[in-house]
């Protein structure tokens, strides 16, 4: 099994051949510089023999039909195995939901990105593949981060694509960070990747990026890289800047980041999440409305249970509208312009 990986250098192929689990782990060297370990299906670690200061997690396929990040991560893994890219920082790649990749669907039974921070074991417990996988992914992130000194720089980029189009093609969600400022340097790293829009979340969630931010104080982001497309139909030239910056990060090459400049980025503050309370929940706007579409104060965004849900601020933009979620889950995030007061500008 692992001999095939060493010959083909195609980790995605190995992952999809064993979508549920791999019975045995393996470890091998690439050249005289990197130790490689496969911990499970879709879980591979590159450990430089001369260790540096960063621990990097790159995750994709938390939703199985979000294919551009899957292709990007597999290209990076292949480059590392072929020694076209040499790891100078520790890096863990996670292909989140292999069964859903094969199925070409967002998930099999349940949205994996609503099952972290222990949500996998709440309620009915570990009753489906996504809940079991969420618990395993938490374990692998813990194994990767916890064995290192806390002063190391921990990073987690959870890569996605969105269901609908967006006025800002690429954007990132910066998880809630009580008592910690947001990193201006990380925002400018994202800008150099071609991701010029950042949303600051306002509350705890059960997402993968918040798990790493909360438990390991990682600079963690949920990163949206455009719209969902079938495997092989992504225009990978749209990710040249992102791939180049990830190559530099992993290879410990100079990042050459600009100083923080608010004029180069679009910053939004999440002001509320609207959860579905009744089965009759419906939006008033059409299904083709793009992410970051703005609505004026008083505008009726949605209706449910005989009540109108209105825009509360002077202007609110919306992201991730989805009326089809189960009762109790989030239907949309509402945004307002953000200030820089809670950003560490590095001055």
Swiss-Prot record:
CDD domains: M14_ASTE. Its cofactor is Zn(2+). It is an enzyme of class 3 (hydrolase). It catalyses: N-succinyl-L-glutamate + H2O = L-glutamate + succinate. Transmembrane segments: none annotated. Pathway: Amino-acid degradation; L-arginine degradation via AST pathway; L-glutamate and succinate from L-arginine: step 5/5. GO terms for molecular function: hydrolase activity, acting on ester bonds; succinylglutamate desuccinylase activity; zinc ion binding. The keyword Zinc applies. Its EC number is 3.5.1.96. It holds the Pfam family AstE_AspA_cat. Binds 1 zinc ion per subunit. The active site is at 224. Zn(2+) binds at residues 63, 66, 160. The keyword Hydrolase applies. Keywords: Arginine metabolism, Hydrolase, Metal-binding, Zinc. GO terms for biological process: arginine catabolic process to glutamate; arginine catabolic process to succinate. Belongs to the AspA/AstE family. Succinylglutamate desuccinylase subfamily. Transforms N(2)-succinylglutamate into succinate and glutamate. This is Succinylglutamate desuccinylase. It comes from Shewanella sediminis (strain HAW-EB3).
